From Swiss-Prot:
HAMAP family: UPF0637. Pfam families: DUF1054. Gene3D superfamilies: Protein of unknown function DUF1054. Belongs to the UPF0637 family. This is UPF0637 protein OB1420. InterPro entries: UPF0637, UPF0637_domain_sf. Signal peptide: none annotated. The lineage of its organism: Bacteria, Bacillati, Bacillota, Bacilli, Bacillales.
Length: 205
């Protein structure tokens, strides 16, 4: 299993859409394929449900190169954006590991309501966890700063999102060790499985 190197992070300093996309495809996507296939297999076993690997294509982009790239694991073979999904991705200064609920979710309000009703479970995750309210931005808040109003916004505002998990900063030694990194990612996803399952159950009600 291969980890991530400084060269992978430097991909996002390359100017030009075609040039950056070529670097993403040659440097990062082979690692996503390797990590993602194992994640899909391991998470399928843990959820007792078939999960599928998706790798971001950035196909809608015509001018601006992407600032980050990611893999997604979801229970739908055709796509992931309309479903609760797991994400591993790279910005220029960190790797993110998310349970992701983004604005395309058709049952967003149901899932948000379930999370509000189980708010204590959300807050019981380790304090090292972070939350993003917009997947396009680097910013994340500490789980300790999360309150119900964030989830109410996620419920009520069409474009609002909720992603929860961990960041690993560029330069952290674990990134270079693929096997250790994989175990770290799996540990995060295992801790997030109850919230994933709650989202799936709420979606399917």
């Amino acid at each position: 299993m291969n980890g991530f190197t400084n060269k992978d992070f430097e991909t996002f300093n390359i100017n030009g859409l075609d040039e950056r996309m070529e670097a993403i495809q040659t440097r990062i996507q082979p690692k996503f394929q390797q990590i993602g296939e194992s994640l899909a297999e391991d998470l399928s076993k843990k959820t007792n449900n078939e999960l599928y690997l998706h790798i971001a294509k950035h196909a809608r982009r015509t001018v601006n190169p992407p600032n980050d790239t990611w893999l997604a694991i979801a229970d739908n073979k055709r796509g992931y954006k309309k479903h609760p999904h797991f994400q591993v991705g790279v910005f220029d200064d960190h790797v993110f590991i998310w349970l992701a609920l983004i604005y395309e979710l058709p049952n967003k309000s149901k899932i948000a309501s379930a999370y509000i009703n189980h708010f204590d479970e959300v807050k019981n995750l380790p304090t090292s966890y972070v939350v993003s309210l917009d997947h396009t931005k680097k910013d994340a808040i500490s789980l300790t700063d999360l309150n119900k109003s964030h989830l109410e916004r996620f419920r009520d505002v069409k474009k609002a999102e909720f992603l929860i998990g961990k960041h690993i900063e560029k330069g952290d030694p674990i990134l270079a060790n693929g096997d250790e990194l994989y175990q770290f990612i799996m540990d995060v996803f295992e801790q997030l499985l109850p919230l994933y399952q709650l989202a799936i159950d709420s979606r399917d009600e």
